[in-house]
Amino acid sequence: MSKIKSLDILFIFFTFIVLCLGTWQIIRLYSKNDLIINLENNLKKSSVSFNESINEEYIKVSLNKKNLDSKLFLYYLHKGEIGFKVIIPYEVNDSQVVLVDKGWVKKDKINLLKKTLFSNEVVEGYTKKIQKKNLFTPDNNIKEDFLYSVEIVSLQKSLNKNIYPLLIVQTSKTSKDIIPNNYEIRLSNNHLQYAITWYALALVTIIFFLFYRKKA
């Protein structure tokens, strides 16, 4: 009898935990939806002149600064095709630069772009976090012409300047060989699927528990 009671407690405890996890995912779903709405509203506002006090993502900005004679080519797949994001640093002040994502270029155009001098055009775009390297991202190889990730510390050393913590994603047109970026918010929002999974697991557990109790 004591063994049955112990298993009862285990089933109840497990079901409670799984239901809590499902409910937590629902809370996260509403929170993420609110965040996406706020960010979409930011992109509907008029552009502001870029300044160092901007610390939020998806703020529309215009940048009229001098670009450095330096280019980074970041490995990036576009619609399944291998290519590169073209990243160029722009001077914010004497000690700081901001990185600008100019857009995407095909692999066979990279040598041409290396020789291209970009004029000090007014950049229109929006702010975004600089993507951090994850466990599955290969290490950068100095022998290669492109990067797998932007390594802030090493880049600051090579430029001898601080890097503004947000990237500017340029949406205005630039070189004819570069496919410009779009205004888009890329935030994963799979919390509904996760919640359904947890609730389904709870339902299966309850059915199994009732079947077990009937047999006991």
Enumerate the language-model features and the residues they cover.
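Surface-exposed, charge/polar-rich loops and edge strands
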Residues: M1-F50, Y58-A216
